[in-house]
Amino acid sequence: MIRTSFLAGALALLAATGASADESSKAAKVTLVYEHELPNVPGKSIKGVLVEYGPGGFSDGHTHPDTAFIYATVLEGAIRSQVNDGPVKVYHAGESFSEMPGDRHGVSANGSETKPARLLAVFVVDTKQKELTYPLKK
């Protein structure tokens, strides 16, 4: 149920951006892989999200809930990332980065046009929070 609503939200986000067929073929595949309430932190949950990029793949600019802390680890390949107005950085397999509550993620993309890339984003977020990603306002 959660996975279905998360994926439906991701698809709605993609549709709302007016992506062309070519752009949608480059869109990231996003899968909720786990979700657990934190027993020692009432009202908070930890959610793991696998983000898979094909060659040249990307996610549109986005933000997350104001209560979400995200810690991302690159599992395969290389990820280009820009948080807020900082520089675009490239993270390789085994490297990690974080996003603080309210941060804007302007660039999130595969660093390669020929190889896939994957990252695991771990969210600490309000348990009642269902949507994890919102498009950046243009």
Annotate each PLM feature:
Residues 5-16:
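Bacterial N-terminal signal peptides
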Residues 17-23:
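Sec/Tat signal peptide C-region and signal peptidase I cleavage site
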Residues 25-61, 67, 122:
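A short glycine-rich, His/Asp/Glu-containing loop-to-beta-strand
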Residues 38, 42-43, 52-54, 85-102:
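Short acidic-glycine-tyrosine-enriched beta hairpin
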Residues 60-65, 83, 90, 108-111:
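Short histidine-centered beta-strand/loop micro-motifs
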Residues 67-86, 93-95:
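Glycine- and acidic-residue-biased ligand/ion/polar-headgroup-sensing regions
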